């Protein structure tokens, strides 16, 4: 049994004896696996209820299903999805679930030439010899910039967990324009932008991005490598505009996901390894972990006052956020709120009042009132745990929470394969002792084992409670079999009424994690570039040609469907060649490709875009450069001869 705590969880009131056979089987299998893990700690598995409330209504029975766009119609929402270990960001249309675009981020992409062109290599980062520094990535969490509590359409950010990088996407062109590698961090997992400045009321938009380091390491990572007790994690703040690291915080425990308050004063991360264990049994040994809060203004004041250190070769200021250094609330930089065992996920409610931590190994969600956290920092609250206003049971394996803007929360239950809809105010009343407060509103079976979820506009003050997307980690029998590797199952749900309605399944290539959904009118994408955006642009085909400077050769050419400005160009074996291509077409959707056989080169240029590649002409002969991206009825004739003389 879990040990008692002043905020011991309350139990749900909606148990019913009916559990569908498939989910009963999956519950049993999942619980058996959990029991094996928990047995390593000599502690029992947390109790909870997973009963379904009955068969869900079908999409055909529900009017909102008619909002699915017909051919030629546009979706009403954008969705930005992480790609997982494909290392990209994906753009979806909602509510159709149609994948519209993939934005290359941390790994090469042969279609667009990401990691091949000089421009993309500059963003990705290279070694001294010009090779890419990294060729793999693992994107988990995507979030966008804010103004006045809603998305402003400027930027989106996404993490790379493998190599601790933060990537930024310009939402006017849907391209990655900057990547920053975080110093002294491994397992960079959760991210979240701030929503306004904590001090200056005129700065009502995002200026910081907070990043959580999940894996503790020696600091620097060359000293004490055999002593896990000395490993530590860092919480990082990155400047939203320059993408430079502003500061870091040394903490006890680790970081998982990240949330920020709407007033800009607080950031937080849930912690599942306050034990700072190096083995998973140790990571589950404590009955309660923490939601760690950061007082942003105080941290930046400490940095400005010089109360920091640096680590290794990094020049980034690092302040002390450990328990020992933050005993006095009136000077503390951090506050550790106790939450049940191994939480997974912390989310900010759109009414700006609460952060909610889901329990994972506890069947509970913990509601933390932000005003009380600020009271503790001001010395007005006796104990930081008094900021907890509810801790209620939801079901087995709660992970992540979304909101509908009507006071309801939606939490994924991994072991139960369910979404539970619950009312926050009712949960608070129930926690205070009102046993008539029915906080569980509805349950819906999903297929199967849901991880992340998000609702339309959920993480803004404009949460509209229309659609919910759920990322199910296992698709099992939902799609045609294609061999051992299954797709993920993204399920879309109508949440506009009292009951949740499952609308559709979508197979998606492994392995997305988090995502956001927002109204399309918040974005104003440009579909044709400006020539002036590119310093290397060749603005007139007459400027095309070959310029030699010793062994270094520059080839300039333009493209206008269906031809390149140079029908052929000559090089000598051993030349270092920089080829610059400008697309002079001004027609939307008229993208050109450029491939050089046997030279491992392919890239595209969109209308009015310029891109370049550099390579060694090490193979003599004739090589037909051709357009790989269909652009004209004479597409196959769009070629140029590269002649390399021996």
UniProtKB/Swiss-Prot annotation:
Its cofactor is Ca(2+); Cu cation. It catalyses: N2 + 2 Fe(III)-[cytochrome c] + H2O = nitrous oxide + 2 Fe(II)-[cytochrome c] + 2 H(+). Cu cation Z1 binds at residues 344, 400. Residues 1-52 form the signal peptide. Cu cation A2 binds at residues 627, 629, 631, 635. It comes from the Bacteria. GO terms for cellular component: membrane; periplasmic space. Cu cation Z4 binds at residue 513. Cu cation Z3 binds at residues 141, 452. Residues 1-21 are annotated as: Disordered. Residues 551-646 are annotated as: COX2-like. Its main location: periplasm. Binds 2 calcium ions per subunit. Binds 6 Cu cations per subunit. Each subunit contains 2 copper centers; Cu(A) (binuclear) and Cu(Z) (tetranuclear). Cu(Z) is thought to be the site of nitrous oxide reduction. Keywords: Calcium, Copper, Metal-binding, Oxidoreductase, Periplasm, Plasmid, Signal. GO terms for molecular function: calcium ion binding; copper ion binding; cytochrome-c oxidase activity; nitrous-oxide reductase activity. It is found in: Periplasm. Pfam families: Cupredoxin_1 (PF13473), nos_propeller (PF18764), nos_propeller_2 (PF18793). Belongs to the NosZ family. Homodimer. This is Nitrous-oxide reductase. The gene is nosZ.
């Amino acid at each position: 049994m879990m040990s008692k705590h002043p905020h011991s969880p309350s139990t749900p009131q909606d148990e019913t004896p009916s559990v569908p056979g498939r989910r009963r089987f999956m519950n049993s299998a999942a619980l058996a696996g959990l029991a094996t893990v928990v047995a390593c700690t000599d502690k029992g598995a947390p109790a909870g209820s997973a009963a379904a409330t009955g068969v869900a209504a079908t999409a055909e029975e529900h009017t909102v299903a008619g909002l699915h766009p017909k051919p030629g119609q546009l979706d009403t929402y954008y969705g930005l999805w992480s790609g997982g270990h494909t290392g990209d960001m994906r753009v979806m249309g909602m509510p159709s679930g149609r994948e519209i675009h993939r934005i290359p981020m941390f790994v090469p992409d042969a279609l667009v030439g990401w990691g091949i062109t000089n421009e993309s290599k500059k963003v990705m980062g290279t070694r001294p010899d010009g090779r890419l520094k990294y060729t793999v990535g693992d994107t988990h969490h995507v979030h966008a910039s804010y103004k006045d509590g809603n998305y402003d359409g400027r930027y989106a950010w996404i993490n790379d967990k493998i190599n601790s990088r933060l990537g930024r996407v310009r939402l006017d062109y849907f391209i990655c324009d900057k990547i920053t590698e975080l110093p002294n961090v491994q397992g960079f997992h959760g991210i979240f932008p701030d929503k306004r400045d904590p001090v200056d009321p005129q700065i009502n938009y995002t200026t910081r991005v907070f990043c959580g380091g999940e894996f503790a390491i020696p600091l620097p990572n060359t000293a004490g490598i055999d002593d896990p007790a000395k490993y530590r994690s860092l919480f990082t703040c990155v400047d939203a505009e320059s993408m430079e690291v502003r500061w870091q915080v040394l903490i006890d425990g680790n970081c998982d996901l990240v949330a920020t308050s709407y007033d800009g004063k607080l950031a937080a991360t849930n912690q599942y390894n306050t034990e700072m264990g190096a083995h998973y049994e140790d990571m589950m040994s404590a009955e309660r972990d923490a939601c760690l809060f950061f007082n942003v203004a105080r941290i930046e004041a400490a940095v400005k006052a010089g109360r920091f250190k640096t680590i290794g070769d990094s020049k980034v200021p690092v302040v002390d956020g450990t328990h020992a250094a933050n005993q006095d609330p009136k000077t503390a930089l951090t506050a550790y709120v106790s939450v049940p065992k191994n939480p997974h996920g912390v989310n900010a409610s759109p009414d700006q009042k609460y952060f909610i931590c889901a329990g994972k190994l506890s069947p509970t969600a913990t509601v933390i009132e932000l005003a009380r956290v600020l009271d503790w920092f001001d010395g007005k609250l006796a104990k930081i745990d008094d900021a907890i206003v509810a801790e209620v049971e939801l079901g087995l394996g709660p992970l992540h929470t979304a909101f509908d803007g009507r006071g309801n929360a939606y939490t994924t239950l991994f072991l139960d394969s369910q979404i539970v809809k619950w009312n926050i105010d009712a949960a608070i009343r129930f926690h205070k002792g009102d046993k008539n407060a029915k906080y569980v509103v509805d349950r819906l079976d999903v297929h199967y084992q849901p991880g992340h979820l998000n609702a339309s506009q959920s993480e803004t003050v404009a949460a509209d409670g229309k659609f919910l997307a759920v990322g199910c980690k296992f698709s099992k029998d939902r799609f045609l079999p294609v061999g051992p590797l299954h797709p993920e199952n993204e399920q879309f749900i109508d949440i506009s009424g009292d009951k949740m309605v499952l609308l559709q399944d979508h197979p998606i290539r492994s392995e997305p994690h988090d995502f956001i959904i927002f109204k399309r009118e918040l974005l104003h994408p440009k579909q044709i570039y400006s020539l002036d955006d590119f310093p290397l642009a060749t603005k007139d085909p007459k400027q095309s040609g070959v310029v030699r400077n010793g062994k270094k050769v520059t080839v300039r050419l333009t493209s206008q469907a269906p031809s390149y400005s140079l029908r052929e160009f000559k090089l000598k074996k051993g030349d270092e060649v920089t080829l610059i291509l400008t697309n002079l077409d001004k027609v939307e959707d008229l993208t050109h490709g450029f491939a050089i056989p046997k030279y491992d080169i392919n890239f595209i240029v969109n209308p009015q875009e310029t891109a370049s590649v550099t390579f060694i002409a090490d193979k003599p002969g004739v090589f037909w450069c051709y357009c790989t991206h269909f652009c004209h009825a004479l597409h196959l004739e769009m070629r140029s001869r590269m002649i390399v003389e021996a």
